[in-house]
């Protein structure tokens, strides 16, 4: 048994990694800011201690895991170096852990978390599988053969991984504080592809992924006729989405998923192709796909009187469009209201017009103040800059969420990667107080 201390244990990758090590009978604790994050719920359930930052948290018998958001001059990291402790960056430790399993890395500019969650759900129902999902969920399963994990492209961290398989969902320009442009992102994915050991499952409808060269078999999935795994006859029903799958030109089977939207079908195709490559029984894969309840903060639904409230992590224009599409396919002619909080000034500045176009797909738009990050607390753009590009858009301030009551029988999409949940909770409290 080892003793681990996580610096930044509430991170979306750090929290599940801590859970995995805890499940493997290690002693695990960590430190972070006091502000509540959804990622700490699972830590609390497992009794993993969360401490305020303090150099005194570091002791001589620990292995230290350093979160990506924390620099080498953080007081706890400085103390760990003084004591001569072994210190791993998050991505370094994850890369070493994955080497002990048949590993599947899920990467892409969008859809990583949902696809990782879906693959983990399917595989763990068929054979022992450990997993790390970027919604704060992780589990280390005894006697696991497989390890399914989310692999982020930011700062090329995924180059620390050498997985057996990789699912690549798409390539898009994001993280403009690091990548110089789309070509830089494509280059990063190309580097990653060269490190995969057995096979790559990639979305063939993404023209950027079609450029990828690999030293292993490359299987494509999508809607286009050129794909190896292809979805046809896609139908939205009251209980989800059904579609036929063809493997090249041969009928493979009819599948049903609880989710809606083209992105949900693509995620399922990626999982179907991966499981076929690993020779997992098709009928069991079908059964598991039908019982997937989603991951945290990805179209997470609740009801409030006659309204549907959706909590979603969408923070890029393409993700916003996918969320609006899913709402329309599931709820038909009901009004779709977008409540959006931009995440980082750099991202908003880089994609200002694209955000405006995506948000305009909703019937009504409310904009919340920009959420900075640990790396960026201020910038040269304002929320009013975005408002001016969307006809009829409103600014939503804290304390003013009661205005959302005006949208009877609507679907309210609370979208963002910051603390948009606080706006939703405030609105829920306003309505409950009036009941």
Swiss-Prot record:
Pathway: Cell wall biogenesis; peptidoglycan biosynthesis. It is found in: Cytoplasm. Keywords: ATP-binding, Cell cycle, Cell division, Cell shape, Cell wall biogenesis/degradation, Cytoplasm, Ligase, Nucleotide-binding, Peptidoglycan synthesis. It catalyses: UDP-N-acetyl-alpha-D-muramate + L-alanine + ATP = UDP-N-acetyl-alpha-D-muramoyl-L-alanine + ADP + phosphate + H(+). Gene3D superfamilies: Mur ligase, C-terminal domain, Mur-like, catalytic domain, NAD(P)-binding Rossmann-like Domain. GO terms for biological process: cell division; cell wall organization; peptidoglycan biosynthetic process; regulation of cell shape. Its EC number is 6.3.2.8. The keyword Acetylation does not apply. Belongs to the MurCDEF family. HAMAP family: MurC. This is UDP-N-acetylmuramate--L-alanine ligase. It comes from Exiguobacterium sp. (strain ATCC BAA-1283 / AT1b).
């Amino acid at each position: 048994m080892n003793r681990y201390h996580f610096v930044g244990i509430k991170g979306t990758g750090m929290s599940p990694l801590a859970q995995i090590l805890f499940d493997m009978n290690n002693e695990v604790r960590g430190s972070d800011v006091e502000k509540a994050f959804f990622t700490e719920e699972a830590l609390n359930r497992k009794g993993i201690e969360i401490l305020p930052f303090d150099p005194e948290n570091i002791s001589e018998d620990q292995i230290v895991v350093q979160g990506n958001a924390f620099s080498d001059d953080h007081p706890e990291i400085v103390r760990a170096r003084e004591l001569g402790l072994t210190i791993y960056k998050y991505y370094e430790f994850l890369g070493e852990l994955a080497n002990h399993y048949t590993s599947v890395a899920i990467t892409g500019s969008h859809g990583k978390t949902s696809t990782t969650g879906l693959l983990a759900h399917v595989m763990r129902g068929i054979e022992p599988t450990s997993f790390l999902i970027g919604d704060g969920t992780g589990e280390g399963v005894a006697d696991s053969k497989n390890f399914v994990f989310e692999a982020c492209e930011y700062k090329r961290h995924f180059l620390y991984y050498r997985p057996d398989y990789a699912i690549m969902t798409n390539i898009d320009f994001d993280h403009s504080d690091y990548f110089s442009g789309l070509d830089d992102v494509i280059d990063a994915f190309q580097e990653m592809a060269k490190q995969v050991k057995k096979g790559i499952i990639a979305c063939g409808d993404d023209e950027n992924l079609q450029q990828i060269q690999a030293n292993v078999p490359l299987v494509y999935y999508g809607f286009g006729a050129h794909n190896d795994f292809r979805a046809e006859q896609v139908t939205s029903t009251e209980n989800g989405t059904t579609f036929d799958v063809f493997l090249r030109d041969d009928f493979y089977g009819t599948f049903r998923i609880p989710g809606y939207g083209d992105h949900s079908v693509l995620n399922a195709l990626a999982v179907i192709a991966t499981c076929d490559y690993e020779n997992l029984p098709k009928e069991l894969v079908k059964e598991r796909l039908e019982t997937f309840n989603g991951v945290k903060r990805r179209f997470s639904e609740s009801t409030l009187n006659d309204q549907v409230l959706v909590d979603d992590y969408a923070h890029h224009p393409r993700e916003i469009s996918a969320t609006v599409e899913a709402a329309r396919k599931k709820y038909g002619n009901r009004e779709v209201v977008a409540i959006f909080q931009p995440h980082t000034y750099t991202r908003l500045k880089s994609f200002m017009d694209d955000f405006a176009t995506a948000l305009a797909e909703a019937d009504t738009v409310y904009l919340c103040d920009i959420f900075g990050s640990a790396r960026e607390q201020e910038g040269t753009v304002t929320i009013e800059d975005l408002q001016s590009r969307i006809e009829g858009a409103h600014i939503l301030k804290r304390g003013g969420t009661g205005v959302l009551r005006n949208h009877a029988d609507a679907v309210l999409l609370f979208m963002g990667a910051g603390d948009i949940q606080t706006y939703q909770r405030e609105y829920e409290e306003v309505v409950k107080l009036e009941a």
